[in-house]
């Protein structure tokens, strides 16, 4: 209950469409924290951690939402995070109330996700061939 007002859901949608209603709230929030005293590529390590957590959850039927639109100062205080650590993301885990589908990213769609006629999420993404090269 303390975390909910400090995170923003579906920032491209109006709050009444993108914010979970009572009974739809996550069952768990995880704070992803980076230790800035450890040398290396924090962004890569964070991405690997996020991918593994969300894929493992999905394999068990649990949905997730990686949240970057968060009130970092307030969450840092709430969670007692101190230097050299810093809050990178919050991840919400729970059982999805809506379906999500990846749709092609085009000039017309841009990156903004939207709701279809069934109120399910359509999330524009670049194709695998646009982001990867195979040898």
Where are these regions (language model features)?
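Acidic, surface-exposed loops and disordered segments
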Residues: 1-135
